[in-house]
């Protein structure tokens, strides 16, 4: 019989760098239409916060049993604190570059009967200190076996080529999860 084995995720620390965001959900019942506009009124009964974007990638890596490290950009606010707490509870070592002048990106979904009624985005692209982010990443590369770049076009990976070159100089494989508009990674860039 053929013997299958799972990879040893616990022996491959992974560094995720990218656009972190908070996915916030408000759940409630709808029982009437608003008199102000033809929209349902939701009476919020519960809410939940989940790591989104690159933070969700790191969360999934940790769930597989790997040591997950995360570098990203947030505001200095309640949403960033919620993200940090959720990630810490899941075993993710999150290191945020916190910016005073901008809020953490939040995607708020209003749900009723397991149906999304509305999504509200609280975001503006981050104007990051790309050099400082690169220093943070380079200081962690000695601890990891894989670098994952998770780009949602929100500004954290403005200087992705520097990160790729630093990883390749250490023979660390780079995986890219580009969702942004301009993310040209080609194999010939070695």
Regions found by a protein language model. Name each.
Residues 35-42:
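Peri-catalytic substrate-binding/gating loops that frame the active-site cleft of hydrolases
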